[in-house]
Amino acid sequence: MYENISTMDDFEFENKWVLLRIDINSTVIDGKIEDDERIKRHLGTIKELMEHDARVAILAHQGRPGEDDFTTLEPHAEIMSEELDNFEYVPDVFGPTAKKKIRSLEPGEVILLENVRFYSEERINRDPEWHARRHLVRNLAPLFDIFVNDAFAAAHRSNASLVGFTRRLPSCVGRVMEREIEVLETMVRDEMEDGVFVIGGSKIEDAIKVIRRAIEMDNVRRVLLGGLVGNLFLWASGVDLGKPSRKFLDMKGYTGYLDEARELLEEGDDVILVPEDVALNRGGEREEVDVDELPADAPVFDIGTGTIERYRKEVESAGMVVANGPMGVYEEPGFEKGTYEVLNAIADSEAFSVIGGGHIIAAAKACGAYDSIDHVSTGGGAMLRMLAGERLPAIDAILTCPFSGC
């Protein structure tokens, strides 16, 4: 799919102004970054550019408007400054302060610009040509020689900072993106047998697309569901979760996916597994019940022990396991069991294993499974969509870049 993508090996960076897009979107609680995995992953690309005497300005985002984690990039800059010399944080995206700093960059220097999602048009999904005419690209592109996109975790989006510069500058992928493409394309191309997808978390839209694709794939044997995804599909299967869980799904706007979930359960009834028992949060205590004992007046916070054992057996006999999203609210004491035990089953299995997404990576570190996973992807939604055979707009934009060297 992406065999001919341009990489950093195709360019000379000495004394060039390089605009680097990375994805350091992280879990932020009370202004503090809880896991710096994504930040650390991009250091290799940044240091390589510095070693080649490039003048580097970095674009990145954090959170979404209206969410608690929609913050400045100052906490990220603090972590990066501990690892990088000649590094500076600039609290501006493309205003006079940012432009002045960019123009004054010396070879081997790096600046991190402000959260690009502070700019409203960044959040619009449009084609590269449309974004190339917007303020962000028109203001920044003339200041640079090369655009490097290393933001694999956001590659399934078609935002201005991800696709627009490919119509104004010679462009390539960075080292993180290159490695992700290499590993995931190999998995798709080789069609590893006895595939098992473990889908949890709360990204319902992404999950629906991947589940639809997975049940069509001959090499995917099972799709195991947990988290809010599992709760939604349980509801769609006819299980009354109880008012607290129904209310939460409705508040998040996920009830609109119930009909699609019902369709998928009918089409993939021999592939999709939903929880057979769950753990309720009753006043902070874990209470396990079979799904036929629902509805409950307490919210569902995890999969139950029976489901864990069932999922463990599926994972143990798999040839390939792909996991995205936790099985429950693993951050809450007592409700990490499903996520941790399924992750440890994946780590202990003989299957080629891939996990992706910020929450499941943090959970894998916490339970000791991280080092036994074959490939830890920086992307959640991007990873799942690529494995499902979907094209990723940010990578396609580089493939169709009209400049020499792209």
UniProtKB/Swiss-Prot annotation:
Enzyme Commission number(s) of this protein: 2.7.2.3
Record protein name field: Phosphoglycerate kinase
Keyword line: ATP-binding, Cytoplasm, Glycolysis, Kinase, Nucleotide-binding, Transferase
Subcellular location: Cytoplasm
Lineage: Archaea, Methanobacteriati, Methanobacteriota, Methanomada group, Methanopyri
One family name in Pfam for this protein: PGK
Binding site for ATP: E331, G357, G358, H359, I360
GO molecular function, one term: phosphoglycerate kinase activity
Enzymatic reactions: (2R)-3-phosphoglycerate + ATP = (2R)-3-phospho-glyceroyl phosphate + ADP
Cellular component terms (Gene Ontology): cytosol
Keyword ATP-binding annotated: yes
GO terms classed as biological process: gluconeogenesis; glycolytic process
Family: Belongs to the phosphoglycerate kinase family.
Amino-acid positions noted as binding substrate in the UniProt annotation, renumbered to this chain: D23, I24, N25, R38, H61, Q62, G63, R64, R117, R157
Listed pathway(s): Carbohydrate degradation; glycolysis; pyruvate from D-glyceraldehyde 3-phosphate: step 2/5
